[in-house]
């Protein structure tokens, strides 16, 4: 059995880590380099760095900050935001990242997933899916540009297509649960897990250690990502791992 992974997420805007609710109402959470070093020492299994306004603002990811963060880490590091070309992927990997997360660019041009996987390997390509429940459809719809633009893709269909094109991992964020701290969106994750044949990272909604227990108990995800509960010291990675050990989960 593969060990479940606990992944802190650094949402970065203008060089600072921020966190909001449902992608809005952002507040400062600290310096990305300092937080990265802290999480590495605390026992994080991986780290995700998302330049959350790069795609919306049409600019490149902050490579200098990525390089600084990578220099502090001994754990795998994924970077996303504003990655639109193979040259962007190469630049981020050379700056020290192990994987890239692509979202808007993949939806605008799905062939980009295959190009990235063919050139750098599927293990480097994480496709991020920002999904929000559509009451009229009774299912989840995918959004781009940091949750600002609705697409015609249903989350389950896009997950299947992303995997078919070469995604090595899916980072699934529930926009409904983002920052709400009421637990991961288990119905969404169940739906994605049923169609995905690659590892799924659960994101959006973690509010306590028991939320990690729930998402792993049903095997709806291979890893779980959280931001605000770690940034604001509401719980710690060690506390989450201790709780998972109590439940008999396989963790690092």
From Swiss-Prot:
Alphabetical list of Gene3D superfamilies matching this protein: Aldolase class I
Assigned keywords, A-Z: Amino-acid biosynthesis, Cytoplasm, Histidine biosynthesis, Lyase
CDD domains the record matches: HisF
Span of the signal peptide: none
A biological process term (GO) from this entry: L-histidine biosynthetic process
GO cellular component: cytoplasm
Transmembrane segments: none
Pathway: Amino-acid biosynthesis; L-histidine biosynthesis; L-histidine from 5-phospho-alpha-D-ribose 1-diphosphate: step 5/9
Keyword NAD belongs to the record: no
GO MF: imidazoleglycerol-phosphate synthase activity; lyase activity
Catalysis performed (reactions): 5-[(5-phospho-1-deoxy-D-ribulos-1-ylimino)methylamino]-1-(5-phospho-beta-D-ribosyl)imidazole-4-carboxamide + L-glutamine = D-erythro-1-(imidazol-4-yl)glycerol 3-phosphate + 5-amino-1-(5-phospho-beta-D-ribosyl)imidazole-4-carboxamide + L-glutamate + H(+)
Active site: 11, 130
UniProt keyword Amino-acid biosynthesis present: yes
EC numbers for this chain: 4.3.2.10
Domain of life: Bacteria
UniProt subcellular location: Cytoplasm
Stored SUPFAM superfamilies: Ribulose-phoshate binding barrel
Function: IGPS catalyzes the conversion of PRFAR and glutamine to IGP, AICAR and glutamate. The HisF subunit catalyzes the cyclization activity that produces IGP and AICAR from PRFAR using the ammonia provided by the HisH subunit.
NCBIfam families xref list: hisF
Family stated for the protein in its record: Belongs to the HisA/HisF family.
UniProt subunit comment: Heterodimer of HisH and HisF.
Protein name as catalogued: Imidazole glycerol phosphate synthase subunit HisF
Source organism: Shouchella clausii (strain KSM-K16)
Chain's gene name: hisF
């Amino acid at each position: 059995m593969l060990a479940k992974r606990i992944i802190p997420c650094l949402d970065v805007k203008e060089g600072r880590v921020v966190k909001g609710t449902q992608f809005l109402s952002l507040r400062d959470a600290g310096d990305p380099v300092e937080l990265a070093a802290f999480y590495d020492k605390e026992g994080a299994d991986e780290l995700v760095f998302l330049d959350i306004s790069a795609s919306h603002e049409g600019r490149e990811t902050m490579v200098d900050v990525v390089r600084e963060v990578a220099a502090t880490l001994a754990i795998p590091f994924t970077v996303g935001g504003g990655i639109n070309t193979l040259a962007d992927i190469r630049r981020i990997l050379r700056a020290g990242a192990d994987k890239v997360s692509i979202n808007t660019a993949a939806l605008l041009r799905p062939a980009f997933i295959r190009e990235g996987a063919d050139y750098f390997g599927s293990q480097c390509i994480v496709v991020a899916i920002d999904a929000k429940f559509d009451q009229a459809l009774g299912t989840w719809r995918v959004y781009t540009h940091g949750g600002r633009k609705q697409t015609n893709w249903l989350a389950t269909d896009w997950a299947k297509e992303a995997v078919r094109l070469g995604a090595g991992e899916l980072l699934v964020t529930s926009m409904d649960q983002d920052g709400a701290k009421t637990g991961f969106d288990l119905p969404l994750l169940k739906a994605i897990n049923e169609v995905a044949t690659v590892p799924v990272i659960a994101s959006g909604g973690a509010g306590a250690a028991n939320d990690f227990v729930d998402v792993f108990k049903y095997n709806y995800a291979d890893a779980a990502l959280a931001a605000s509960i770690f940034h604001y010291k509401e719980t710690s990675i060690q506390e989450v791992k201790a709780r998972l050990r109590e439940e008999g989960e396989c963790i690092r």
